[in-house]
Amino acid sequence: MATIVRQNGLTPIQETNEVKSFLKERGIDYDHWKVPHNASNLTDKEVLVDTEKEELLKKLDDRFETLKAKEGYQSRDLIVLHPNVSGLNEMLAKFDKVHYHTDEEVRYIVDGSGVFGFAFKDEKFLVHVYKDDFISVPRNTNHWFYLDDKKRIKAVRYFQDMSGWVPNYVEETNSLD
């Protein structure tokens, strides 16, 4: 379950309904989608070859079909990050700067964990996401992402249009201070 860390030492938010409510008030869609048990043979592996990635995506396709029907999503892929990924730090450096996309950024965390940061006009906060978390960052929302200390995540990325997923960087710090 996601945890929200706020500025100025405010108490973290951990209860699912409170997390959903907090994020919904800010236009961020959040849900808790259990990864099917028949996928654990793949989610438990650190490294997946392309055929295993496709097999895992197929086991999760009910979610994709729902997003296609309801919101017009056209494609999806699986990103698998772990400490042994070549160029991991360089890759992560693209995401840890404050940016926005002209399309939604939609993620379904199927293993591991990471942190989304959000910068609104008068508020910054972090959302620590874990396995089974679904989050949709609205288009044109300033945010950033980094891996936590475990440096391990498997996430399905859903796209309506790949051209809208290009990051547009802004002059904003990713610090909660």
Swiss-Prot record:
Fe(2+) binds at H99, H101, E105, H143. Its cofactor is Fe(2+); Ni(2+). Signal peptide: none annotated. Pathway: Amino-acid biosynthesis; L-methionine biosynthesis via salvage pathway; L-methionine from S-methyl-5-thio-alpha-D-ribose 1-phosphate: step 5/6. InterPro entries: ARD, ARD_bac, RmlC-like_jellyroll, RmlC_Cupin_sf. The record marks R107 as: Important to generate the dianion. The keyword Metal-binding applies. It catalyses: 1,2-dihydroxy-5-(methylsulfanyl)pent-1-en-3-one + O2 = 3-(methylsulfanyl)propanoate + CO + formate + 2 H(+); 1,2-dihydroxy-5-(methylsulfanyl)pent-1-en-3-one + O2 = 4-methylsulfanyl-2-oxobutanoate + formate + 2 H(+). Binds 1 Fe(2+) cation per monomer. Keywords: Amino-acid biosynthesis, Dioxygenase, Iron, Metal-binding, Methionine biosynthesis, Nickel, Oxidoreductase. It comes from the Bacteria. GO terms for molecular function: acireductone dioxygenase (Ni2+-requiring) activity; acireductone dioxygenase [iron(II)-requiring] activity; iron ion binding; nickel cation binding. Ni(2+) binds at H99, H101, E105, H143. Its EC number is 1.13.11.54, 1.13.11.53. GO terms for biological process: L-methionine salvage from methylthioadenosine; L-methionine salvage from S-adenosylmethionine; methionine metabolic process. Monomer. Belongs to the acireductone dioxygenase (ARD) family. Catalyzes 2 different reactions between oxygen and the acireductone 1,2-dihydroxy-3-keto-5-methylthiopentene (DHK-MTPene) depending upon the metal bound in the active site. Fe-containing acireductone dioxygenase (Fe-ARD) produces formate and 2-keto-4-methylthiobutyrate (KMTB), the alpha-ketoacid precursor of methionine in the methionine recycle pathway. Ni-containing acireductone dioxygenase (Ni-ARD) produces methylthiopropionate, carbon monoxide and formate, and does not lie on the methionine recycle pathway. This is Acireductone dioxygenase. It comes from Leptospira interrogans serogroup Icterohaemorrhagiae serovar Lai (strain 56601). The lineage of its organism: Bacteria, Pseudomonadati, Spirochaetota, Spirochaetia, Leptospirales.
